[in-house]
Amino acid sequence: SAASDVYKRQMLLGIGIFPLCAYAQQKVVIEDEEPNSIMFVSKNKAGDEIIRIMNDRSQMRFHDPNAPRFLLTDQKGKFALGIGGYVRATAEYDFNGIVNDVDFYPALIPQRGSGNFAKNQFQMDITTSTLFLKLVGRTKHLGDFVVYTAGNFRGDGKTFELQNAYAQFLGFTIGYSYGSFMDLSALPPTIDFAGPNGSAFYRTTQLSYMCDKLKNWKFGVSMEMPSVDGTTNNDLSINTQRMPDFATSVQYNWNSSSHVKLGAIVRSMTYSSNVHEKAYSATGFGLQASTTFNITKKLQAFGQFNYGKGIGSYLNDLSNLNVDIVPDPDNEGKMQVLPMLGWYAGLQYNLCPSIFISGTYSLSRLYSENGYPSENPESYRKGQYLVANAFWNVSSNLQVGVEYLRGWRTDFSSATRHANRLNM
């Protein structure tokens, strides 16, 4: 059927990753006697303003889908609804050590002799295949606006799970999306869906504002829904939170592919003590510096550095370990925030318009305070992540890639484990 043909054309079948950008070619004025009618048009026939808003990827990362090829638009070309997505299939082979996840987290490299003695592992994954709806438009009072929802199949039992649902207008973002203590455009390309273990990555419900009225500058503030992942025991529990998280950022751009961004976040984390029969709060904070820039026309650099206390939920590797707040061994019935950091540095080289290669090294580190971890010296202290990959844009709708990953996990006991993975 025609509907089936349209659906097939707007989906991407990929091995490893995603669709490529398609840009507007020219503006076509569509005449219609019915003022409230809508039309199904290809992207190059929509208005220039609609295409510009639809193609904006300033708040998306490498793994996110691009604008759909076909749109539903009103006859004046001021509003458009895109329905699209992609199918993403990966094959993974671990050797000389495994990671207990389809994503490559060094924190999840299992301890030797922990019940699984296999050193090799084969997996396939299609759960990051994505569907989305994107409504864009331009009005007199709201200016450019976007309503975006997207999801993949990472829910329980590979069910559909919401990944983004937000509205943007006049610089405001309201809804569920990537957190403000991130820099999406500074993330390097990877087939691995998690990416560098020392990068900041999380999603949250938020009210944020971004000002870009000054040339080359962006300023942002946000209020975010708190989510605290801590280590508890019989005397300590984490339940109700009393304060939102607050984040701020400033970014300077000197061309469309180069910027430096500084960010900060502060959070108050509430826990209850059965020993004192009272609720307490521990304060966490994070500082971030990130960048991406052109070294030459074919060479791009990526980098990020994060440091703080109680920000484990925001950092890729540490988000698996419940270390936002942990028991204080020196103070019974109390919890503490630990210092932690994460960073990465990477390069991408474009061999030709359709082929590029990249490599990234990343590190995540958790520090000890007040005797932590006194009861478990095999707790995570440091993780390292190394990735090298190559991508080929076979066509405007198909991209394939191959990737090598190596990870190391070092515990407070100084014991180290490692794993290797091939992705394609």
For the regions a language model picked out, list residue spans one by one:
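Outer-membrane beta-barrel translocator domains and adjoining extracellular loop/strand segments
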Residues: 97-100, 157-163, 185-192, 230-238, ...
